A protein has these predicted regions:
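Conserved SAM-binding loop
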Residues: 12, 86, 104-107, 139, ...
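Asp-based, Mg2+/Mn2+-dependent phosphohydrolase catalytic module
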Residues: 1-2, 95-98, 111-216
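Active-site neighborhood of HAD-like aspartate-dependent phosphohydrolases
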Residues: 1-40
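Short beta->alpha linker loops
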Residues: 42-46, 70, 85-89, 110, ...
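Helix-loop "lid/cap" segments that line or gate small-molecule binding pockets
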Residues: 26-27, 46-61, 118, 150-151
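Metal-dependent phosphoesterase signature
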Residues: 29, 33, 54-92, 100
Length: 216
């Protein structure tokens, strides 16, 4: 194995809990009630697919543009006053991978400006050779496009890359791409079928680093 491709939200950073708070706030403001539960339904999906899920759930009860504006207003205000919450073991696994000369990429469904801002805020941007974001590919997770493109830019076949994911849609994308897929659960817990499909389920990124070391 020569490459490692990381999801971002819920995997490297505890950003999904911030989105739960944001959508509870937005739902209350728009009169539809707390909508943080929608985070589970849209885990790993890009902005356009997320909008589609909101349309399917709420129909004409809320204005799509207003939901987007208020969401990012809340998120921007949060990160203006707080650092991005880093997941346990992130720096450790990145140091481990760099020490063994792995090529490392991000494959996140979030927009490019958000991904780059979070990586810089956490002071880990220097670890990544490639950054792939949701607005760089035509098809969102669970389609495998973003993982295939990340591996291509790393100049590696997907079979030579680990993929690290926390969401169902992300896991489906990584598995379909041919990456050796490791799950680190966050808000969504895998069923027995998914557990059998992935290479490993690890409680955190420290445990994932131990798994990689044993998988040589």
């Amino acid at each position: 194995m020569k490459g490692a491709i990381f999801d971002m939200d819920g995997l490297m950073f505890d950003t999904e809990s911030v989105f739960v708070k944001a959508w509870d706030y937005v739902g209350d403001r728009l009169g539809i009630g707390p909508a943080g539960f929608m985070v589970i339904e849209t885990l790993g999906m890009n902005l356009e697919v997320t909008k589609q899920k909101w349309r399917e759930r709420f129909g004409g009860k809320c204005d799509e543009a207003e939901v987007e504006r208020m969401t990012y207003e809340y998120i921007d205000d949060y990160y203006a006053n707080n650092h991005v919450p880093v997941k346990k073991g992130l720096k450790n696994i990145l140091d481990y991978l760099k020490g063994y000369r792995y090529r490392i990429a991000v494959a996140s469904s979030s927009p490019e400006n958000v991904v780059k801002a979070h990586l810089k805020d956490a002071d880990i941007d220097k670890y990544f050779d490639v950054i792939m974001c949701g607005d760089m590919v035509a098809k969102s997770k669970p389609e495998p496009d973003i993982y295939i493109e990340a591996a291509t830019k790393l100049k590696l076949p997907t079979s030579e890359c680990y993929a690290f994911e926390d969401s169902e849609s992300g896991l489906k994308a990584a598995l379909a791409s041919g990456c050796r897929t490791i799950m680190v659960p966050d808000l969504w817990q895998p069923d027995d079928v998914m557990r059998q499909k992935v290479a490993a389920v690890c409680k955190d990124l420290d445990e994932a680093a131990v798994y990689i070391d044993s998988d040589k």
